[in-house]
Each structure stands twice: as C-alpha cells, then as structure tokens.
Curated annotation (Swiss-Prot):
UniProt GO cellular component terms: mitochondrial inner membrane; mitochondrial membrane; respiratory chain complex II (succinate dehydrogenase)
UniProt organism field: Bos taurus
Cofactor: [2Fe-2S] cluster; [3Fe-4S] cluster; [4Fe-4S] cluster
Pfam families: Fer2_3 (PF13085), Fer4_17 (PF13534)
Protein known as: Succinate dehydrogenase [ubiquinone] iron-sulfur subunit, mitochondrial
Transit peptide stretch: 1-28
Binding site residues for a ubiquinone: W201
C-alpha cells in the first residue's frame, strides 16, 4: 500500500510543480505590467505677477499615474508637493462641496477634485484658470467681482415684519420646500458664470448665471417677503437680460444644476411683475 501511495505522489508531483510554475509566471507578468510606468503630461498655465518680467505661459509636468490618485486635483497636489512647490491653486474639501478648485480642464470649466484624469497617455492634459477673470497667480482667479455681485442680491431671508425674528420657526410646506431643489445645491464655484459669453463681455453689469440662480432661489422661497423688491432690482437692461440662452452654464455645471432654467423663470416673473406695475 505504501508503494502505491508513493507512486501516486510521484505521478502527481510533476503536474503540481508545473501548475505552480505557471502561477508564478502569471503573477510575475502581472507585477511587471503593474510596475510599467504610465507617464502622463500636464500643461499648466503659469504666471507670477510678483516675478519681474514674467509673462503668462504654459509649463509641462510629467507624472507616473501609477503613483497618483485618479483625480486632476491629485495630480496638481502631487506636482506641488514633489516637483514644483511654486505652483499655486485653490483647494479645500476634495469632494465637490466647497467649489474652491474650479478651473478650466481640457477646455471645460469644472472642479479639479471631481474630474478624473484622462488616462490617454498620448494626450497632454491642459489646465487653465477660470476664463475671462483677472488672475491673481497661476490657477487662482480673482473672484472679488463675482462675490460682490452675489452680495448685491441679498442672499438671505428678508421679512417685512421682523418683530418675531428668532422667536419662532418660519415653517414651510413640503411642496414649497421642493421648489428649492436644484437651486440651493449651488456651491458658487463660478464654473457657469465664467463659461458664459455674455458674462465675459458684460461681467461688470450682467450678474451671470450663478448669481441669478441664487436670486431666483430667494425669490421663490415661501418664507421670503421681498420677491417684488428683488425683481425690481433686476429691471435694468443688463442685470438679467444679457442672458441669451446659450446654455453653456447648464452644460458645464459640476453639480448638474440648471442655471439657464432659473434665469428663464425669473424672466417670466419679471413679465408678470411689469404687467402688474403698469396696471397699478
């Protein structure tokens, strides 16, 4: 019996050894494939106003995608930490909530933290600051005018009787609350406004898609008492009516919102408001 078992083992051993060799070869091939570098080029807008004689230019960096996270912001952070500490950009939450890392990536305005790196190694990823804005440095745009416009619409609840302020809740029906969906989620990243040709040419007077969508959000809030006053502020030829429904704003919004629709709704409300004023 022992001889039979030994013979059986000898017969099985060569097959087991062959299988083990195949497994090791397969694992070795996988390891080699995983270790093969995947070099990706990034051409990034650079300009430092504090550097004498410096002019806007593109600077190219190379990164091995095997050692980098999947998002464009991961690449930017890797470049700043490991290659060029002078590269300047905004970032904070890294999950599409704060809007800080808004920039133009491969021709479209979006958030660097939610935009995946194009893994086509033959293409250079091009990164610019938000278009048609003054640049503070590198990928950092000056949003002073944008924030001033946002402040001008008074983005908060306004009550004509404030005697009960802080004493009771301003209740809202489920239906009225649902009207705010698709509006309050705006993170003020300015991707939409800086993709709008009308805002490019009239940014000092036209409020732009982001601010107008926020204006609409407060106009239709059932708890707010200043809808007509808010409309009255937008009657001039520029604040609202420079929108020509190009719809770049809706196409580029990283949160999937529809500023163009909100602006159209304001125009409807404005028509009703003007009719009421004319008949008064």
């Amino acid at each position: 019996m022992a001889a039979v078992v030994a013979l059986s083992l000898r017969r099985r051993f060569p097959a087991a050894a062959l299988g083990g060799a195949r497994l090791q070869a397969c694992r070795g091939a996988q390891t080699a494939a995983a270790a093969a570098p995947r070099i990706k080029k990034f051409a990034i807008y650079r300009w430092d106003p504090d550097k004498t004689g410096d002019k806007p230019h593109m600077q190219t960096y190379e990164i091995d995608l095997n050692n980098c996270g999947p998002m464009v912001l991961d690449a930017l952070i890797k470049i700043k930490n490991e290659i060029d500490s002078t590269l300047t950009f905004r970032r904070s939450c890294r999950e599409g909530i704060c809007g800080s890392c808004a920039m133009n990536i491969n021709g479209g305005n979006t958030l660097a933290c939610t935009r995946r790196i194009d893994t086509n190694l033959s293409k250079v990823s091009k990164i610019y600051p938000l278009p048609h804005m003054y640049v503070i440095k590198d990928l950092v745009p000056d949003l002073s005018n944008f924030y001033a416009q946002y402040k001008s619409i008074e983005p908060y609840l306004k009550k004509k009787d404030e005697s009960q302020g802080g004493k009771e809740q301003y209740l809202q029906s489920i239906e009225d609350r649902e009207k705010l969906d698709g509006l309050y989620e705006c993170i003020l990243c300015a991707c939409c406004s800086t993709s709008c040709p009308s805002y490019w040419w009239n940014g000092d007077k036209y409020l732009g898609p982001a601010v107008l969508m926020q204006a609409y959000r407060w106009m239709i809030d059932s708890r707010d008492d200043f809808t007509e006053e808010r409309l009255a502020k937008l009657q001039d030829p520029f604040s609202l009516y420079r929108c020509h429904t190009i719809m770049n704003c809706t196409q580029t919004c990283p949160k999937g919102l529809n500023p163009g629709k909100a602006i159209a709704e304001i125009k409807k409300m404005m028509a009703t408001y003007k009719e009421k004023q004319a008949s008064a």
